């Protein structure tokens, strides 16, 4: 329907012969009624309340967008004729409008068409680290600072804004409601909780002080409310372990496995978590799917060699925290393989910096289910705790017993990893070592290959093992695995055992293997073998297992190369070194003792001061790790007096005066 309205009689238009055609494309009837007051002021009143007046530039632009025809409306408007109309409403809203404009929520010029809402992705795994929402959050922080300083009125003057107060017709509202209702599933994850992640330190400190003050009000009422919220969260998490739909479980598991990146895996899992939290029942989040999701995330990180900082940023995401919390909730219901996958995944994602309480939880559950573990589970769980420097004595005692009962099912790579784990955390492994001595007595049971073999120790699929344990099992090792086993026996002080003798004799067959100083793997292997050989010469010369002179020289040259052995002096070590000068003694820094480098040494009196940082100790128990104990024992066997100074003990003394007194105290009797 269209109507032609002659405006020549109503307005002084330039040019006067212009006629405007108004076409209604949406079947809305446009009724035009003229009055004498509107003639005088140059205003065209319309029956549609949304566009009651046409005169000011903002209204002219709006009508122009609707009709696409009225291009020559007058600019002058008689405010007295309009009376109390839209301008008064606009002036009342000016104080609040500048804030909306400052945050980018409205169009300051009102000349652009309204932005269409883009289709939002279901989940954004790394939105906080890679997205551009930090701009909006920075403006919100600035807005809080402006309001706190009482500068809102001045900002309103600096940023004037005339915003129309539009009144939408009922038909339009109904249509938009319909559209909004259809888009609800796509916007499930668009919450404002993510905006709290990247506030600056000043705002966080202010908010922390405010929380402390509020918590002390009303007799701790707010603290009680906080505890209730935690209980509600625990109840909500408990519903994830309820009955589930088998078909939904299979579909979710397939989607997790087919995801090619860690971000995709987390996105698929986060969708389901949010859906279950909003009432999806039965839940497809079975313990198997949760363990698989964590395992695939870690494996995809390994596949692309994701940097450590990137992994930590990934682990701090809200979706990732929810997934780990679910894994801890359903951990008792997981199978042995699921517990193994979760522990391995946490070690790869968080390393030694994250998941302290989570690993305690894993240790508790794993100890209760250790009887269900196979050789692969035992090796992977032990390796996860060792790589995170997380001590778990009770768990490792049970793992040693379990490994001794199924020793014939172990592969060479699994034995190497298990022994390295016990040695790294300096955990006793007598049942395991005794079973190795009894199961592998002959050197014919050991095979060595010089090239690296692709192993699948981290895969979910279990290895098939023959049930015929009556025959003598055979083990295959590569060069690096032999080095790890030999180093582990040296750390544990068990080089007199028969299994070590067989391993060491097999390792000597690598005499023809060419060691190069240009490759890190060769240098690491040579360093391990060199230290073990020195331990054999110093601690157990009666065994006569030390290497021949030619091979010893070759390994010594590769192990002592500076290409991959660059020394880094920590600030802690520098601080202690400055205080040692005041003792008046001639201390030597980075002194070499038969392959080991002593931090500070008094060479004349053979006193070695070891300045041990956090990497020398377990992160949760504070006990020395295996490599630290081996160094102390070896330097002591070389005839030196070893004094250890840990960072934790150092920080307990404040001020240089107290620290110097502590140094003199621990050195008493050695100098």
UniProtKB/Swiss-Prot annotation:
Extract the Pfam families matched here. Answer: RAP
Reply yes or no: does the keyword Mitochondrion apply. no
Protein's GO biological process? chloroplast rRNA processing; defense response
**What positions does the transit peptide occupy in this chain?**
1-78
Which cellular components does GO assign to this protein? Answer: chloroplast nucleoid; plastid nucleoid
Q: Which molecular-function annotations from GO does this UniProt entry contain?
A: RNA binding
- Induction note: Down-regulated during infection with the bacterial pathogen Pseudomonas syringae pv. tomato avirulent avrRpt2 strain.
Q: Give the phenotype of cells or organisms lacking this gene.
A: Retarded growth and photobleaching phenotype. Enhanced resistance to the bacterial pathogen Pseudomonas syringae pv. tomato.
State the UniProt keywords alphabetically: Chloroplast, Plant defense, Plastid, RNA-binding, rRNA processing, Transit peptide
Q: Where is the RAP domain?
A: 607-665
Record's subcellular location: Plastid, Chloroplast stroma, Chloroplast nucleoid
Per the entry, what this protein does is: RNA-binding protein required for chloroplast 16S rRNA maturation, an important process which supports chloroplast gene expression and biogenesis. Binds to 16S rRNA precursor and is involved in its 5'-end processing. May act as negative regulator of defense response against bacterial pathogens.
Protein name per the record: RAP domain-containing protein, chloroplastic
Q: Which organism is it from?
A: Arabidopsis thaliana
Report the gene name.
RAP
